[in-house]
A protein has these predicted regions:
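Claisen-condensing/thiolase-fold acyl-transfer catalytic domains that form or cleave C-C bonds
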Residues: 1-98
């Protein structure tokens, strides 16, 4: 229903979306017969994402999580996929459900 992806490195989001849509990448790198598919751009960071909230270093994850939880509460239902970087080339993902 909702994708909240920390876009401090916006090129990473664009590359990931392109990879998910690519039959060749999904077949050769992920061993899938079909692509993962496209992310509905209207469901991606609908409130502007972490850059829009000021990219607070050290608190981005909490801000992204809190924002997604608030959006799900306003809708009364749904799921959100969250992804944030943790520095040093690492990242964390989570799925919220209401």
């Amino acid at each position: 229903d909702l994708f909240e992806i920390h876009e401090a490195f916006a090129a990473q989001i664009l590359a990931t979306m392109k990879a998910w849509e690519s039959p060749e990448f999904c077949r050769e790198r992920l061993g899938r017969l079909e692509p993962l598919g496209a992310i509905d751009r209207g469901k991606l960071n609908p409130k502007g994402g972490s850059i829009a909230i000021g990219h607070p270093f050290g608190a981005t994850g909490a801000r992204v999580l809190g924002g997604a939880a608030k959006q799900l509460a306003a809708r009364g239902h749904g799921r959100a996929l969250l992804s944030v970087c943790t520095g040093g080339g690492m990242g964390v993902t989570a799925i919220l459900e209401r």
